[in-house]
Amino acid sequence: MSKEKILRTDGNVSRSGAVNAESYDAWASEYDRELANWGYEAPEQAAGLLKGHLEDFRDAPILDCGCGTGLTGLALRAAGATGHLTGLDASRSSLETSKQKAVYDRLEYADLNKPLPLGEGAVGGILCIGVLTYLEEAAIFKEWLRVLRSGGVVVFTSRDDFWQSRGIAEMLNRLELEGRWEALHVSRPMPYLPGHPDFADKVKAVYGVYRKS
């Protein structure tokens, strides 16, 4: 199945927007059900982290970067976010599913490996959950810093096996040393899909929380 191209424990994952969009398009109709069966709670965890670290969480404009079928949008609204919520994703079928949840103010197709269709300082918060695996990290970090206003907060997940092997920790630390942002929280590796037969023990998630200077 197409999802097997993206749920890989060996880390051999494509960063092609077109390839991954095709896989998620094929999976969109079953995505929510299967993720629930696998005990997926990352959206709720991430929304809670943003709420705990973003002072004006309730009213701030927020970007769901790689919104997929809208699970993170639902979690944000359930956590009390009432501000303008933008969802961007490269899977058109996932966007259609997300639209049915009626939690976003703006939903738009976007290749997240290209500049984000937002102005400088447009949002106060960003969530990027389960998406960094498919992106060029250095480029998306710079884009987050561009679209975040000063004092804005980004919460993201990274596969624990990529944290060092892809140099993610080093990139984050370099940007912090440059004074671009401040690390507020970096979690230990956490269960990501605890009910998945392959992911449960082999792949965990690190949650990062950073505030723009």
Language-model-detected regions and their locations in the chain:
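N-terminal, positively charged/glycine-rich alpha-helical extensions of SAM-dependent methyltransferases
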Residues: M1-E30
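Conserved SAM-binding loop and adjacent beta-strand
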Residues: D32-G48
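Class I SAM-dependent methyltransferase SAM/SAH-binding core
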Residues: L63-P115
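A short acidic, Gly/Pro-enriched loop at the edge of an enzyme's catalytic core
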Residues: L116-I126
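A short SAM/SAH-binding and catalytic strip from SAM-dependent methyltransferases
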Residues: G124-A138
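A short glycine-rich, Lys/Arg-flanked "PGG" loop and its adjoining helix->strand segment in the class I
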Residues: A139-S150
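Conserved beta-strand signature within the Rossmann-like core of class I S-adenosyl-L-methionine
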Residues: G151-D160
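Class I S-adenosyl-L-methionine
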Residues: R180-S213
